[in-house]
Amino acid sequence: CHGFRNDSKVKLRGEGPAVMQLQSGNTYRFRPDGSAIEPVTWGQVNPFGMCFDRWGDAYTADCHSKPITHLVRGGYYESFGKPHDGLGFAPPMTAHDHDSTGIAGVAVYDAAQYPAEYRDCFYVGNVITNVVHRDVPQWRGSSPWISAPVDFVSCPDPWFHPVDIQLGPDGALYL
């Protein structure tokens, strides 16, 4: 993920002067040895956190647009003043903004340690409201849809700001 107003140039490893221009909001994939980089999606504003579900589908948490985005390879997503490719923007997976623009981190829970109702849900950190939201997807064909988030963890302590969420190898969610 590449954040808002962070246009960068990346030199690829190997022979020759191969340089790739990274544009803000887009997502990219790299070869482990640094010899190749390619765009996966275009748009978004400030993706801040990424996860993959059990089927290998990618999701991002994005500040200032949709809290969770299902990344469809080659898709264009709404951003500040950026056009789509002529076919329109990829479909959103929620109309709810989670009550802020400070979304940071997303994890999908696909382990077996939590009760069934908490599995296959998305967990999103909200650093403005001091909440970790649990987003329960309803599937519309192969596309997930989130009606509204449910508070999973909330804290009145002003120092509690969930900036990242990860699923650990032990099946626990780490904030």
Task: Name these PLM-found stretches.
Residues C1-L175:
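Beta-propeller domains with acidic blade repeats across secreted/periplasmic ectodomains
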